[in-house]
Structure formats: structure tokens, C-alpha cells
Amino acid sequence: MSAGHDYTSPDLARSALVLIDVQNDFVSGPSQVDGTGERVPAMARLLAAFRAAHRPIVHIVRLYVPGGSDADPPRRAAIESGKQIAAPHTDGAAVPGELLAHPLDYDSLLAGGVQHVAAGEVVMFKPRWSAFYRTALEEHLRDLAVNTVVVAGCNLPNCPRATLFDASERDFRAALVTDATSQVTPERLADLALIGVETLTTADVEQFFEAAATSQERQ
């Protein structure tokens, strides 16, 4: 009896990396998420692997306009009262330089624009948890014929998790790079496994792309 098709295994040859909320305030600033700073070196390796393989990269950032009301409900009161978290045009909102040297175009991002920072590499602003909510992410990935969303970044239980669920709901294959994501626990990985999300390490990704490059050279 046939086991049927495999609809969930990552297809890295048709993948895009979505790096979520890796910004100075969350790495080492006043709103830091424990464990994020320690994972920046793995994130840098992951970015290098995708860049070398010429696969798409999307940096997703969170921006809170001081005093603005378009913030998620758990943080809205704090933002309205003057607290600054990843405020546009501040160092806290920037992506660490070792991950992205290009400055962010905050005004364009807040207006819903897609900022192109290098060949195959863009930045998008998301106003809530999921990178798919009120963004151009799905259209961008479809235009590039991507079928696998590889997620890494800051604080798995919040934005990476929401993004992985939304990727699955849109019939993308989905994978989480565990050593390049903060706040990973066995319980959270078990929840993701139930919706078909597979786990990878940075070394897994590097080895796949290195093997693919070697195979192509031999042809």
C-alpha cells in the first residue's frame, strides 16, 4: 500500500529564509529576549549559506511608532504612554550590523513597502505576530516560486511560531532552524511538529547547499 506523497519535508532548493525580529532592542537592548544575542552567530552563518546559494532572504522587522495606536494589544498601552520599543529611526530598531549592513528605510517600510537591500534580499515590516499578516510576504514568495519557508530569529513562541502556522495554512512547506532561533523548547517543537513543521540546524542547511554546489560543479 502506498504511503502517499510527502507534502511537508523541506525542499531547500526552492526555499526562502525568513529571519524574524532580529533587531538591536530585542538582541541586547531594554526589550531583549533571552538567548537571542547568543544565537546571532548562527544566524550570520545561516544568512551566509542562503546568500552563497543565491536563495531568497526576507528580513522581517517590528516597528513601534512612539505614541502610536497601531500596536499589538499587549504592548499598546506601553507604546501610547511613551515607551520606546524598536522605534523607527533609532538604533534599537536596526538589524545588527553583522546580519545586515544596509540601513533600514523606515518610512517606506511603515508604508508597506518592500525594501530591497541586495540581490534576492529584502526587508519587510510586520505590524503583528505573523510575518504574513498585512505584508507582501506571500505574494513575494509566490513570485519567486518558493515552496519552503525556512524560519529563524527571535522568540519562537511569538512571531516565529505565528509565522510557521501561517506558512502551513498557505500550503508552504515549513522548517525551523533551531540553533538560530531563541526561546526554543521541546514543548514548542512538539506543537510545531503536529502541523508538519520540520526542524533543521544551521549545519544541516550549510551541508545541503554545499553538496548542491558541489554536484552542480561536477555536471
Regions found by a protein language model. Give the residues of each.
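Short glycine-enriched, charge-decorated loop/helix-capping segments at active-site entrances
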Residues: 30-37
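A short glycine-rich beta-strand->turn/loop micro-motif centered on a GG-aromatic cluster
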Residues: 148-154, 171-186
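Active-site alpha/beta core segments
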Residues: 41-144
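Short Gly/Thr/Asp-enriched flexible loops that form oxyanion-binding sites at enzyme active sites
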Residues: 160-170
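A charged, well-structured terminal subsegment
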Residues: 198-219
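Active-site-proximal loop->helix
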Residues: 183-197
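Short amphipathic alpha-helices and their capping/turn segments at secondary-structure boundaries
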Residues: 2-16, 44-52
